[in-house]
Design a protein with these regions (language model features):
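Mg2+/Mn2+-dependent nuclease catalytic core
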Residues: 76-185
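Metal-dependent nuclease catalytic cores that hydrolyze phosphodiester bonds in DNA/RNA
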Residues: 1-89
Length: 190
């Protein structure tokens, strides 16, 4: 709810038309960056594809150079559809071994630098993916990494692992339980 209120306040301060243009540009840039990163991870592209001067390619290169090179040891999958039986589903950007740990890896673009206290929704999302992967594939994912690049080419890395990851998994499961309770309540009222 706080995220929705903050977004509504931003839209009001910025103006609907300008906010829509910023949102559309960020979404397009993020999709293009994700596509390049996926192609790179699948071996479909080499670094020469960065010779072009487009911003999303520069951002992808920052993530590759500072977040993936010599750190991502195994790729188990890209754009992995994951599900927790009868509960939820989603798509993880990358799953593999990162710095020696079974890891969910998520790529994000941002218009400005992030602080960890502002990315709870991202952390909850990756925690949910780790739960789903562990249940369905009997894996032991014990880390989630979010690799971010801003439009100014500032690279950021956010990690949760061990007890902190378990905390986010439990927070996600709590939200999921509330969602299902509200859904059941709404069904009863209909």
């Amino acid at each position: 709810e706080e995220d929705k209120a903050a977004l509504a306040n931003w839209r009001e301060r910025t103006g609907q038309k300008e906010a829509e243009a910023i949102t559309k540009a960020a979404s397009s840039r993020g999709s293009q960056m994700h596509n390049y990163l996926e192609s790179y991870l699948l071996g479909r592209e080499n670094l020469s594809f960065f010779e072009d001067n487009e911003q999303y390619k520069k951002m992808a290169k920052e993530i590759i150079d500072k977040g993936l090179t010599n750190r991502l040891e195994e790729i188990w999958g890209t754009e992995c559809t994951l599900y927790y039986p009868e509960k939820y589903a989603g798509t993880a950007d990358c799953v593999g071994v990162y710095e020696g740990k079974e890891t969910i890896i998520d790529f994000k673009q941002s218009n400005k630098p992030k602080k960890i206290e502002y990315i709870d929704s991202w952390l909850l999302q990756t925690a949910a993916y780790s739960l789903a992967h562990n249940i369905v594939y009997n894996s032991h994912i014990d880390a989630c990494v979010i690799l971010v690049c801003t439009v100014d080419n500032l690279f950021q890395e956010f990690k949760i692992k061990g007890p902190e990851l378990i905390t986010y998994q439990n927070l996600f499961l709590g939200r999921l339980k509330k969602f299902h309770e509200l859904s059941n309540l709404n069904q009863t009222l209909i």
